[in-house]
Amino acid sequence: IILEQLASSYAVLTDDERELGVCLVDIGGGTTDIAIFTEGAIRHTGVIPIAGDQVTNDIAMALRTPTQYAEEIKIRYACALAQLAGADQTIKVPGVGERGARDLSRQALAEVVEPRYDELFTLVQAEIRRSGFEDVLAGGIVLTGGTAKMEGVVELAEEIFHMPVRIGAPAGVQGMLDIVKNP
């Protein structure tokens, strides 16, 4: 048995990042897992009970659409930073029950999504500060997980963390790379 954050780190972090100091943030469905590495070793772990499922629920509630459609809308159209989403781009939002679909701008969708990511990254920042390793993360932040792939996530994270942020993808994997490349 191996700690999930440690296993993920071997797939997506470089040796230099682990040595210089890096925070791995894995945004899952139900939780966001944090692992801080310095001097080549894991030094701190944490779990935040906010993740992709909460973003989906926010979309379902705000747009008054069933959860399965909210998940599809999140994956296909959502943007974590409203200023990057086009107000002129519209999406169809299915209604609940007998209610018909309606049009909504991508920017309006982003205005639902951005506050949840802001909250999540603010909680991650608080956990980093609590760990005492905030000043030794020369490698910055590496985001993984399906919800980390959303447009605007890196830009919003950089605004909040004030350090470099990148999306982590498995390195050194041969064959079927497109399948395993998703963080």
Predicted regions and their residues:
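Helical hairpin unit composed of two closely spaced alpha helices linked by a short loop
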Residues: 139-145, 153
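A contiguous, mid-protein "functional segment" used to position or interact
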Residues: 182-183
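Conserved phosphate-binding loops in N-terminal lobes of ATP-dependent enzymes
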Residues: 120, 127
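Nucleotide/phosphate-binding catalytic cleft detector across ATP-hydrolyzing
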Residues: 1-24, 41-42, 52, 63-115, ...
